[in-house]
């Protein structure tokens, strides 16, 4: 988001980039950085996982890939994103700034977590990532996602079922 320092850019696919390397998607650079971190941790009597021990645990998550059955998949996907955003806005869902697609954030008593719907850069696919903060939240978030993506005839949402 605007105004936040982010030295790491990470994709759900596992691709990552570091500010130290001009945010280039460079797996070899990341691997070397991890080996260095491992050596430093070992020197301090720690393991590599000590670097992430303060992160909150991942409780429930899922990735769903919706195939777009349209020759002009980019235009169709753009329409889906626009309508998804409109439906989410109409429902009053929180939408933090996102440069990757449409991200919804849920912090209520009933459900906690997030949903991200985006376009694939190269394929006729719309990946949706969902993360629930507590046990049972994933199922609730999937139901919300189903409602928000209902009615798109050329969007195969069968992976969400």
Residue ranges of model-derived segments:
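Phosphate-binding and adjacent anionic-ligand microenvironments
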Residues: 1-161
């Amino acid at each position: 988001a605007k105004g936040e320092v982010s030295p790491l850019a990470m994709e759900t696919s596992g691709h990552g980039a570091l500010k130290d390397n001009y945010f280039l998607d460079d797996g070899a650079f990341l691997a070397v950085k991890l080996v260095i971190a491992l050596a430093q941790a070992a020197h301090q009597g720690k393991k590599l996982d000590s670097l992430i021990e303060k992160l909150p645990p991942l409780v429930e998550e899922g990735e769903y890939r919706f195939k777009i059955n349209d020759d002009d998949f980019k235009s169709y996907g753009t329409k889906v994103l626009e309508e998804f955003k409109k439906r989410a806005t109409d429902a009053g869902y929180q939408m933090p700034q996102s440069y990757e697609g449409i991200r919804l954030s849920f912090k209520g008593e009933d459900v906690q977590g997030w949903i991200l719907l985006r376009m694939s850069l190269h394929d006729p696919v719309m990946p949706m990532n969902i993360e629930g903060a507590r046990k049972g939240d994933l199922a609730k978030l999937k139901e919300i996602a189903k409602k928000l993506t209902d009615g798109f005839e050329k969007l195969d949402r069968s992976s969400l079922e």
